[in-house]
UniProtKB/Swiss-Prot annotation:
Membrane-traversing stretches: 526-546, 555-575
Induction: By salt stress.
Intracellular or extracellular location(s): Endoplasmic reticulum membrane
Name of the featured protein: Phosphoinositide phosphatase SAC6
EC main group: hydrolase
């Protein structure tokens, strides 16, 4: 499974005034990579000594080259400046990125004719500062993290010898766009494939057996984004918050994995923030829903085989309209290899009775038993393969989805352990307290990671996944996280969405119609500022209150009170009527008003 051409696992970055030089320090005798700070051009050189400079260079250790991002006035070299080991995937070390750095190759900005580009790039630089704080990024120098254990096993011998980026599944390659320049320059040993998602593992003893459990998530980059600015599907059927979750168990030479997926309802719908707690759901081009859903499930069948779509949204209200549209679209798709199953999570389970998910499992048990899981014996021979996939969704594909997926994962892990011979016929994970506690924590951390990337906060209902029951502390934490989501969705996620679109190539600066990320605003949009509006409302209300207290001193105070109250009400009404304008909105891909 290991690529013949290994990626450099140790690097030293030399920062000269006119160039960056990346020197391998992993014991190989490979060439150094020279990157011009004037135009971002690249070439291989024999040694750092070839670089002449009158100034002492800045030297630092780095852990990989993520890619090169081209902007109007120059390019940015993207490198890993901090990382940590988080475990192993099929026996190969895995690392988490703790710090990214975008290094500018922008000396061309000193040209006075480039002043306009400099102003525009300053705006993009602010987005890159947001991108540097991207969470949940993982890499390996030795193995392809974008592929499941089953797909890795099924790779042909020739494919296994290819560089890791050539083996990679593009939809799960977070830095796919930024690697293009390095690929064009044939710099395979410097190309570091990165995924976004989650990676956690633990080891436990069951009797005399040592069992390793790993849970890895791979986020699709095709429609990546934030909770409120990336909903539903695009016209090609790619959905928001699409995450592939793989659970791997290794014991006594056996390796077994089970894969499931989550993703937004596969038709075009949105929920544009407008300062209300729950913005309205809007179905876009409803006549296209069936076609887009069909395209989505056709893609899933090609990649995973049979599909069971589990829809957890409410049957009534705004969610009900979406669920009805989803069910209607599925009528034209369902057959022997695609099933649709609706389970009103909130109606059946409420806020505390999550044990009722057993009802859902009974309805999907035949599908899971038929389509199974992947299993290798001690000799590395395939004994079973997974033939289908469970696709779970709620509105956000976070909280209800994670509770449900953890239940499915638990049931399948018990089947796997019985098949390997670790568990007896009636034995369950709950029969082993330490195993049970570690497994709950594994899935709780997994859900939090995915939720933070999409919504900005840990998952709701996480206490049930972590402890097996709802707790008062968990309910209070959910309330706090819900408020935090409201703030982030309304006042921060527009900028974060722009940063995602920029680094993943969804908005390409050089060819985009709008050359600056922030077009000129007109009318109310040009002056709309929520903090200022809120300040005016509060100050006006305070003056109105003070004037009311002095009404007895004369009618003048009554008039002042009415004026200040009127200002407060008028500004509040203006903000309420134009809530979308007062929110933090993406500028690169402008949403509908």
């Amino acid at each position: 499974m290991v690529s013949r051409l290994k990626i450099h696992s140790g690097l030293r970055l030399w920062e000269f005034p006119d160039q960056y030089v990346i020197e391998p320090t992993d014991g190989s005798s490979a060439s150094c990579l020279d990157i011009s700070r004037l135009d971002g051009s690249m070439k291989l050189i024999d040694q750092v000594a070839e670089c002449n400079s009158l100034r002492v260079p800045k030297i630092r250790s780095i852990f990989g080259v993520v890619g090169m991002l081209k902007l109007l006035a120059g390019s940015y070299l993207v490198v890993v400046t901090e990382s940590e080991s988080v475990g192993s995937f099929l026996g190969h070390p895995i690392y988490k990125i703790n710090s990214l750095k975008f290094l500018p190759c922008d000396h061309s900005l000193e040209n006075p004719h480039e002043e306009q580009k400099k102003m525009e790039t300053d705006d993009y630089s602010r987005l890159l500062s947001v991108a540097e704080r991207t969470t949940g990024l993982y890499f390996s120098y030795e193995i392809n993290l974008t592929l499941t254990a089953q797909r890795l096993h099924d790779l042909g011998d020739e494919s296994k010898l290819l560089p890791l980026w050539r083996q990679a599944e593009p939809r799960f390659l977070w830095n796919n766009y930024m690697l293009e320049v390095l690929i064009d320059n044939k710099l395979d040993q410097f190309l570091l494939p990165v995924i976004q998602g989650s990676f956690h593992s633990f080891q436990t003893a069951i009797g005399r057996d040592i069992v390793d459990i790993t849970l890895i998530a791979r986020r699709c980059s095709r429609r990546n984004g934030t909770r409120m600015w990336r909903r539903g599907a695009d016209p090609d059927g790619y959905v928001a918050n699409f995450v592939e979750t793989e659970q791997i168990v290794r014991m006594n030479g056996y390796t077994s994995s089970f894969v499931q997926i989550r993703g937004s309802m596969p038709f075009m719908w949105e929920q544009i923030v407008d300062l209300t707690y729950k913005p309205k759901f809007e179905i876009v081009q409803p006549e296209e829903a069936a076609r887009i859903a069909e395209r989505h499930f056709l893609d899933l069948r090609k990649k995973y085989g049979s599909v069971l779509a589990v829809d957890l949204v409410n049957k009534h209200g705004g969610e009900g309209r979406l669920s009805e549209r989803f069910a209607g679209a599925m009528q034209h798709i369902t057959g022997d290899d695609v099933r649709y199953l609706h389970f009103d999570f909130h109606h059946i389970c409420g806020h505390i009775h999550f044990e009722r998910l057993a009802i859902l499992y009974e309805q999907m048990e035949d599908f899971l038993e038929k389509n199974g899981y992947f299993l290798l014996n001690e000799k590395g021979e395939k004994m079973k393969e997974q033939l289908g996939i469970v696709r779970t969704n709620c509105i956000d594909c976070l909280d209800r989805t994670n509770v449900t997926q953890s239940m499915i994962g638990r049931k399948l892990l018990e089947l796997q352990l019985k098949r390997i011979g670790v568990f007896g016929a009636e034995e369950t994970i709950r029969s082993h307290q330490n195993f049970d506690e570690c497994y709950k924590i594994l899935w709780a951390n997994h859900g939090d990671d995915i939720s933070i990337q999409y919504s900005g906060t840990p998952a709701l209902k996480g206490d049930f996944v972590r402890y097996g029951q709802r707790t008062i502390q968990g309910v209070l934490q959910d309330g706090w996280n819900a408020l935090a989501r409201y703030y982030l969705n309304n006042f921060a996620d527009g900028t974060k969405q722009d940063a995602i679109d920029l680094v993943q190539g969804h908005y390409i600066v050089a060819v985009s119609r709008d050359m600056a990320p922030v077009p000129r605003k007109r009318g109310l949009e040009a002056v709309a500022n929520f903090p200022v509006a809120l300040t005016v409302i509060l100050i006006s209300f305070w003056f109105a209150t003070m004037s009311v207290k002095q009404v007895g001193s004369g009618y003048k105070h009554l008039l002042f009170s009415l004026v200040w109250a009127g200002i407060s009400v008028a500004v509040a009404a203006l903000v309420r009527a134009n809530g979308r304008i007062f929110c933090n909105r993406p500028s690169l891909h402008k949403p509908r008003s």
